[in-house]
UniProtKB/Swiss-Prot annotation:
Gene3D superfamilies, alphabetized: Globins
UniProtKB keywords: Acetylation, Heme, Iron, Metal-binding, Oxygen transport, Transport
Family: Belongs to the globin family.
Modified-residue entries (N-acetylserine), positions: S1
Name under which the protein is recorded: Hemoglobin subunit alpha-3
InterPro entries: Globin, Globin-like_sf, Globin/Proto, Hemoglobin_a-typ, Hemoglobin_oxygen_transport, Hemoglobin_pi
Globin domain residues: 1-141
Entry's Gene Ontology molecular function annotations: haptoglobin binding; heme binding; iron ion binding; organic acid binding; oxygen binding; oxygen carrier activity; peroxidase activity
GO annotation (BP), single: hydrogen peroxide catabolic process
Length: 141
């Protein structure tokens, strides 16, 4: 679990994201697909052009889900239960992809919030995203 200072660090960045969720999420997906092209296979019906409506919509869902999770740090499993079901049973996303996206999200946050995304904040986000990944993959068999 996260310490009080780690929770505050995660929430400090969530507070800065504000209405930029779709743009940040779209950028994260674009970087993911460029860096790890094998991840494109989960999105055969998407327009993967950078800045596309599909990437903006799905990217926004990802960032908003993370913001929601950040506001429920004491019950991540409960907050993310439906997403865990979706990824494990319907989408069947390879669990190895979650750390890839977690890394990319940190790159995007560091790029957009360089003065705020300090080493301590990055460490808290790394831990937070690892906890989210663990919840999302908890229902895999």
């Amino acid at each position: 679990s996260l310490s009080a200072s780690e929770k505050a660090a995660v929430l400090s960045i969530v507070g800065k994201i504000g209405s930029q969720g779709s743009a940040l999420g779209s950028e994260a997906l674009t970087r993911l697909f460029l860096s790890f092209p094998q991840t494109k296979t989960y999105f055969p019906h998407f327009d993967l052009t950078p800045g596309s409506a599909d990437l903006n919509t799905h990217g926004g869902k990802i960032i908003n889900a993370l913001a929601g999770a950040a506001n429920h740090l004491d019950d991540l499993a409960g907050n993310l239960s439906s997403l865990s079901d979706l990824h494990a049973y319907n989408l069947r996303v390879d669990p190895g992809n979650f750390p890839l996206l977690a890394h990319i999200i940190q790159v995007v946050l560091a790029t957009h919030f360089p003065g705020d995304f300090t080493a301590e904040v990055q460490a808290a986000w790394d831990k937070f995203l690892a906890l989210v990944s663990a919840v999302l993959t908890s229902k895999y068999r």
